[in-house]
Amino acid sequence: MTKRNILNSYLPDEKPTTGKLLLYALQQVIVMFPATVIVALITGFQVSTTVFASGLATVCFTFITGGKIPMYYGSSFAYLTAIGSLKAGELTFNEVMRTTGGILPPELISIAQFGIIFSGLVSIAAGLLVRWGGKNMVEKILPAQVTGPVAMIIGLTLAGNAISDAAPAAVAVNNLKSAGDALISQLSAIADPATVSATVNSALTSLGDTVTSAMAAVPEATVFNSNWVWVVSLSTLFATLIFSRYLKGFLGQLPLLLGAAVGCGVAGLIYAFGGPEMNLFRSIPEAALSASAWKLGDGSIFALPAFTLPTVSWAAVAAVMPIAIATIPESTAHIYQLDIYVNNEAKKRGKHYDIASLLDRNLIGDGICDMISGAVGGPAGTNYGENISTMAITKVFSVPVMFAAGILAMVISCFTPFIKVIFGIPQAVIGGLEIYLFGAIAAQGIAILIEKGVSMFDSKNVAVIAVIMTFGLGVNYFFGGNINFFGINVPAIAGAAILGIVVNFLLSIGDKKTEAAHN
């Protein structure tokens, strides 16, 4: 038995046997699938094309980085506002989607593609700057007291998504009913002919009737607004935690896959005993799979994704390109997270992997992958923190596994039943996994602070961390993820990172003089 087998882990340059490789890859695909598909559904891009693009970009990323960085490239939420606000005549893309069943026509996707391709230049430029300036320059601009809390808010800003997925419609229904009841109560108090004009009174009464009608359409007794949805999500969560902690050997490296299987099993039992009204399994909208380059028969088994060519649009470049800046602090935090977790495992073998020094390759790879995804008709993206969490949990850091995950995603995108099966996994199951994964991303931020020895008794460090955490979380939960700053929509994470860099710079003035005085 090899030392690797005893430790039950795989380092970046190690390749599992074929059977294990495929299962590890499938686990990574399941982890990336929800976010990547949701981005496609929100932006109106074709689902199969988006999944194919993420797989293709991941495969290319492996070659671009010399097979040294185990990362999965998936669609990024950072670009949603920019793409949705693009104009098609008098309408925005979001408004067009409401008239086309939620899918953008190919000619509009091609406009967005042009902006996405150019956005890749931003990450490439950042990578070249890092290569020119060296690691010391990067650590001065993005020290651990910046990258650590940035990693933390990446995970914590996703906490709301995890809970809303864990109880998908229960949250929405309860919130809608509470808001509706409150609004009707307020309207009833205001709608008094003695205090308002007849016109205003009529308008308020009409609005009250509309709200009442809408409330009548809210489901009363389905699995989605019952406690059973929590049973599924919590079963998934606890099964995953138990498998991660107590399973040994090969099975101990598949806790997310096994946890998802348990969650699906619980959802299946609820459906079997409760009937159709207790069905948590999902169906992907047919419109999301309608377009294809070529179909076998009616496309119900095999259909090549629909690829579109970009159309020149400088408006798309102006809208999309600046958003790429938001992904740079994320990518930097991700590479430091990965470096810490890989080397924590590598030192048990007497090895060392200097992954942090590959930040330039990582950023350049991200930029080229944006171009590749945009060229075939996929959204812009970034490397996924949830896939890093999966590696940290399973201790499978193998580059061949991520390469295989990319190939697997491309294959799945061509087989309609595969997409339907993976998409059909109940949202509550995904939410159960996300509670663990997104929390793990935040925990990795703490690990960066500990590993780099950041003193929490240093007033500068406390100030930088405090500003990043408060701004990032505050903007995410109060302003919905973006804050308008002189007409520019600044994403929460990017804004927090930039603010943290500025605060760190200002509070570092005079540090060298102070050190010299002490010496």
Q: Residue ranges of each PLM-predicted region?
A:
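N-terminal signal-anchor module of multipass membrane proteins
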Residues: 1-70, 77-106
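Interfacial segments of multi-pass membrane proteins
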Residues: 83-90, 244, 387-402, 407-413
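Juxtamembrane helix-boundary/capping and inter-helix hinge elements in multi-pass membrane proteins
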Residues: 42-45, 88-95, 102-106, 131-134, ...
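Membrane-embedded helical hairpins/re-entrant loop segments and their flanking transmembrane helices
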Residues: 10-12, 16-18, 41-62, 322-399
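Hydrophobic, membrane-embedded alpha-helices of multi-pass small-molecule transporters
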Residues: 19-35, 224-236, 254-255, 268-270, ...
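Membrane-embedded alpha-helical modules
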Residues: 6, 107-273, 404-518
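Intrinsically disordered, low-complexity non-transmembrane regions of multi-pass membrane transporters
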Residues: 1-23, 172-221, 278-306, 340-361, ...
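Short, non-helical or kinked segments that cap or interrupt transmembrane helices
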Residues: 45-50, 67-81, 138-147, 252-257, ...
